[in-house]
Amino acid sequence: MTAITNIAAREILDSRGNPTVEVDVLLEDGSFGRAAVPSGASTGAHEAVELRDGDKGRYNGKGVLKAVDAVQTEILDAIGGMDAEDQVAVDEAMITLDGTPNKARLGANAILGVSLAVAKAAAETAGLPLYRYVGGVQGRVLPVPMMNIVNGGAHADNPIDFQEFMVMPVGATSLSDAVRMGAEIFHTLKSALKKAGHNTNVGDEGGFAPNLPSAEAALDFVMESINAAGFKPGSDVVLALDCAATEFFKDGAYHYEGEGQTRSIEQQVEYLAKLTEAYPILSIEDGMSEDDWEGWKLLTDRIGNRVQLVGDDLFVTNVERLARGIETGTGNSILVKVNQIGSLTETLAAVDMAQRAGYTAVMSHRSGETEDSTIADLAVATNCGQIKTGSLARSDRLAKYNQLIRIEEGLGAQALYAGRSAIRQLAGR
């Protein structure tokens, strides 16, 4: 009944107009699953490999026909007839078939598309929503959104070096209430930027991308907008940053090209510490570069007791790198991106390892997204309590928020909004 009978794949476009892989899986009983794979702009060097065609005469070399072909030939031959309900076996079969440590032969985009589509088909067979199929009856925590309302770095064409400035509505009463709060802050910020003579164009993830001179200038606008929208910073809403520091770490120092400054490792740590003292910043992602383990440790020792320090490029949803972080006390949270590792099984393993070690986990989108809302279900399934899925603009971002609203409605009285408990450094305050 749940045997995989057919797999189809195609090349579709993501939110940046670049090709990505979409996969359909059909089971013996007629159940069907479809998944589309996201793509990042600022990618960690240790991520699983996204297979691109390299044909400059087609999509500027970014086509994914090789990955599509891999799905419909080798992967179908390998897992056709397997039980879709045995997710681990299906994923392990594809990983073994690939035969490389980073999925470079078949492509993480090929393997992940199949992995997620198989899970969706199995959920349909079981008559369950995906979050319930993956998470069981315990999957009922609605995550606090990290809403990216100002974009910089690789996600925008402006002088701001940090990549994301986010608001987290920890004081909301529910997920739908959190979405309302975020939307009101977003529109208030738009008015404030326009009044000050700044453009209100948006970046890849739907946040505004004004020409501001520094992180402090961006944070000041965000704080002003929170207050003007009628919320209390630090209580109703806290701030989060994604520095994406790997993008501006060169020759052992952090080069802020937009600001025209260079900071040593020690100066970078102190700069971030001062920002957290001046603003209600409760979460910093990639404050140090992906291989600056020394800097990461210094930052953790300096502010880790009061700020969530999220490893994205540092951990790349990889249990081996996460294990090193846990062993050395580096960071205290992991950003979870399904396409960084390339299968559902490995994604869930990373979340489980983090939670067992007392680290938090943040389910995340990529800057190149589609209408696929799988990560919304996975955030609830894993009870991770936090999700990062962009701003309150662009339908590729709103697809995830809208799915969370539907999940909350479906859970009814069982639904539990994570709120202040999502960030351990905040829960005790």
Swiss-Prot record:
Keywords: Cytoplasm, Glycolysis, Lyase, Magnesium, Metal-binding, Secreted. Its EC number is 4.2.1.11. Mg(2+) binds at residues 242, 285, 312. The lineage of its organism: Bacteria, Pseudomonadati, Pseudomonadota, Alphaproteobacteria, Hyphomicrobiales. Belongs to the enolase family. The keyword Lyase applies. SMART domains: Enolase_C, Enolase_N. It comes from Methylorubrum populi (strain ATCC BAA-705 / NCIMB 13946 / BJ001) (Methylobacterium populi). This is Enolase. The keyword Secreted applies.
